[in-house]
UniProtKB/Swiss-Prot annotation:
Family listed: Belongs to the complex I 30 kDa subunit family.
Pfam families listed in its UniProt record: Complex1_30kDa
Protein name: NAD(P)H-quinone oxidoreductase subunit J, chloroplastic
Organism: Marchantia polymorpha (Common liverwort)
UniProt EC number: 7.1.1.-
Amino acid sequence: MLNILKNNNNKIQGRLSIWLIKHNLKHRPLGFDYQGIETLQIRSEDWPSLAVALYVYGFNYLRSQCAYDVEPGGLLASVYHFTKITDNADQPEEICIKIFILRKNPKIPSIFWVWKSADFQERESYDMFGIFYENHPCLKRILMPDSWLGWPLRKDYIVPNFYELQDAY
């Protein structure tokens, strides 16, 4: 599912991708988004070591983490946006990491232990999409009641039949 591109594809490789290749860290460059932010695809099993490498490289701020359903019955994706914040940076360096996983066993190692701000964001992705973040200290529903069945933002989710009691005014 993931191939490492060679150095002759520098058109879609940014500085971080070249640095990761130099240090033998597996990834797949996906190019740049409309704002010029480098996007990389990472395998779930490579994520813990790569997360630490990103932190060592200087990405000290997790700007956001989200998830989405690629297609009904297909893959789920967990997306991380990191920023390298320094004292004298007018234009901080940013990176986007995408991890695609099968919906049958959607497990990704948690990065809570590197960036504490991942706490509620990973919990929301768990609550809405059912992605299990391994080694998360408190992975439980955050928006839906604990009794809720299923993962409401998956494209194959079937809304349960229930009727709300309404006040008669």
